[in-house]
C-alpha cells in the first residue's frame, strides 16, 4: 500500500518535535508532502526535503496531493482548521485539545461523516505502558472495589510562552489536562461524572492557569483526583490506587501493588463489647506483593516530552483505519466525553 501523504499545519514543538519525528521513522506508511506555518523558517524539515512549504492552512488544504492533515496549530485554531480540512476532503489528525467544547467536537464529527473521512484525536497517552498496566490491574479485581484513584503530574518551573496566555487558548486545562482526564475517564468507566475543579496561575508569567485540581465522583464509582502542578519541587508519584483488597503506587518507571486475600483471614463481625485490655483493633495481614517495570521508561511530569512509543502506536492505528478501514482504537466520540468534563 502507498504511504499516506501528510500535510502538517503548525510546525512548532508538536508538529515538528512530535509528529514529524514519529513519521520520519514510518516512511512506508506516512510521508510528509506539505508543511504550513506562519513563520517562514519553520516550513521545512531535513527528513522531508520535498515537502511543499505553505504560509497558511488554507493553501495547504487546497493541495490535491495532501491526503491527511495534522492540525498542530495554536489551541484556538484546532477545531476551525480541522473542520476546514474535513470540508476539503482530507483525513484529519487533531492535536489536543480536541476543541474547547462539545459543540466543537460535534461539528468536527459531523464534517467527518459528511466527507466520509477519518477524524483522529491525538490522545496518544492512552497507549502509555504505565496507564495500561494500571488499568489492567484494576480490571483484574485483585485490588477489590476501587475507592480512590489519584493521578499526579507535578513539576516546578515558570513558563512565558503562548501557552500562558488566553489569546490562543493557552493554559494547562487544555494543554496537559486532556491527557489526565483521558486516563481518569477511562478508569471511571461508563456514566457521566460529577465534576469539581479548581485552577490557579502560580508561576506562569501569563494569566493562564498552570495548576489544575480536578475531582470526578459518581454513584458506585471511585473518587478520582487528577492534579497538575507547577509549584511542587518534590513531585508526587503519578499513580495512587486504593481498593478494598489493597493498593497500588508508582509512576512511569515502576509500579508496585499489594493485596490481601480476605477469604484466608478470620471472619470478623461487629463486636460491641469493649476490647479486653483497652486495645485497638489489630490483626496481622498476609500481603501478596508484585511490581512492574516497562521495557523503556518515559519521564513523568507536566513538562516531560511524550515517549515515542505511544505516538507510533496511535499512528499505526490511524494508518489501518485509513488504508484498511479497521475501527479506530481511539474515537472522536470517546474523546467527546473528556471534552464534556473539561
What are these regions (language model features)?
Residues 245-329:
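C-terminal glycine/acidic-rich active-site capping loop/insertion
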Residues 107-124, 145-149:
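Rossmann-fold dehydrogenase core element
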Residues 125-206:
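Predominantly a Rossmann-like dinucleotide-binding segment in NAD(P)-dependent oxidoreductases
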Residues 38, 51-111, 310-311:
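Beta-loop-alpha module in the N-terminal Rossmann-like domain of NAD(P)-dependent dehydrogenases
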Residues 1-48:
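N-terminal Rossmann-like dinucleotide-binding module
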Residues 214-221, 241-243:
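Active-site beta-strand termini and strand-to-loop segments that position acidic
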Residues 71, 94, 119-121, 150, ...:
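Hydrophobic residues in well-ordered beta-strands that form the structural core
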Amino acid at each position: 500500500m502507498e504511504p499516506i501523504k501528510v500535510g502538517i499545519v503548525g510546525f512548532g514543538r508538536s508538529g515538528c518535535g512530535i509528529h514529524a519525528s514519529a513519521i520520519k521513522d514510518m516512511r512506508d506508511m506516512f510521508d510528509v508532502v506539505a508543511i504550513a506555518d506562519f513563520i517562514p523558517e519553520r516550513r521545512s524539515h531535513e527528513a522531508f526535503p520535498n515537502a511543499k512549504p505553505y504560509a497558511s492552512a488554507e493553501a495547504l488544504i487546497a493541495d490535491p496531493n495532501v491526503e491527511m492533515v495534522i492540525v498542530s496549530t495554536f489551541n484556538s485554531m484546532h477545531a476551525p482548521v480541522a473542520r476546514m480540512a474535513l470540508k476539503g476532503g482530507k483525513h484529519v489528525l487533531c492535536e489536543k485539545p480536541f476543541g474547547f467544547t462539545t459543540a466543537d467536537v460535534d461539528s468536527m464529527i459531523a464534517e467527518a461523516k459528511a466527507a466520509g473521512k477519518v477524524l483522529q484525536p491525538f490522545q496518544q497517552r492512552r497507549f502509555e505502558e504505565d496507564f495500561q498496566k494500571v488499568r489492567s490491574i484494576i480490571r483484574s479485581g485483585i485490588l477489590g472495589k476501587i475507592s480512590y484513584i489519584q493521578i499526579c503530574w507535578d513539576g516546578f518551573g515558570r513558563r512565558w510562552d503562548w501557552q500562558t496566555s488566553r489569546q490562543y487558548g493557552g493554559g494547562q486545562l487544555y494543554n496537559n489536562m486532556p491527557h489526565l482526564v483521558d486516563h481518569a475517564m477511562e478508569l471511571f468507566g461508563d456514566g457521566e461524572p460529577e465534576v469539581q475543579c479548581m485552577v490557579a496561575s502560580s508561576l506562569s508569567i501569563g494569566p493562564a492557569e498552570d495548576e489544575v485540581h480536578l475531582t470526578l465522583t459518581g454513584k458506585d464509582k471511585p473518587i478520582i483526583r487528577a492534579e497538575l502542578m507547577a509549584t511542587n519541587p518534590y513531585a508526587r508519584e503519578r499513580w495512587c490506587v486504593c481498593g478494598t483488597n489493597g493498593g497500588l503506587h508508582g509512576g512511569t518507571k515502576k509500579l508496585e501493588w499489594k493485596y490481601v486475600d480476605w477469604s484466608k483471614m478470620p471472619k470478623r463481625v461487629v463486636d460491641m463489647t469493649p476490647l479486653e485490655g483497652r486495645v485497638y483493633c489489630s490483626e496481622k495481614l498476609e500481603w501478596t506483593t508484585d511490581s512492574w517495570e516497562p521495557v523503556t521508561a518515559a519521564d513523568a511530569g507536566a513538562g516531560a516530552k511524550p515517549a515515542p512509543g505511544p505516538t507510533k502506536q496511535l499512528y499505526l492505528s490511524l494508518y489501518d483505519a485509513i488504508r484498511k478501514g479497521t475501527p479506530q482504537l481511539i474515537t472522536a466520540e470517546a474523546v467527546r466525553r473528556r471534552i464534556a468534563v473539561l
